[in-house]
């Protein structure tokens, strides 16, 4: 297997581990969020789970199609309990995912996988939307009280 393709597969497996972690993190956050924000944030966290699992499914399929073996292990998952920290952990996760996908997009371009480049751009757009929504939630001064 070409070394550049192998590096791409390794990166995609790292991305996959983080998508698993994001789905678990959002599931955890939906369960533990409490107080006045629970009624608003629980559905928000729950709505993100399917997006992250959709990304994980795509990554798994692509890794296998490229000749790799999809990981079954999730990346480390923070477990904050306060509303602000739940949102901040999610925000950091989304930012890191965008950065990883930008790197993966460059790797895919280098080996000529246009379909993967296009899908990564779509996933970057999804993650950017998640990031912006969390930033709006964090801009509420009551979250910081």
PLM regions and their residue ranges:
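Iron-associated oxidoreductase/ferritin-like identity signal
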Residues: 1-145
């Amino acid at each position: 297997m070409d070394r550049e393709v192998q590096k791409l597969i390794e990166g995609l497996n790292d991305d996959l581990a983080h998508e698993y972690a994001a789905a678990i993190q959002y599931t955890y956050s939906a369960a533990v969020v409490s107080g006045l924000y629970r009624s608003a944030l629980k559905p928000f966290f729950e709505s993100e789970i399917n997006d992250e699992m959709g990304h994980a499914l795509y990554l798994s399929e692509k890794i296998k199609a490229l000749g790799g073996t999809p990981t079954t292990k999730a990346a480390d998952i923070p477990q904050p309990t306060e509303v602000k920290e739940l949102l901040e952990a999610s925000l950091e996760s989304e930012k890191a995912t965008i950065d990883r996908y930008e790197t993966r997009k460059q790797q895919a371009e280098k080996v000529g996988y246009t379909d993967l480049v296009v899908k990564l751009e779509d996933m970057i757009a999804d993650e950017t939307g998640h990031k912006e929504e969390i930033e709006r939630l964090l801009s509420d001064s009551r979250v910081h009280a």
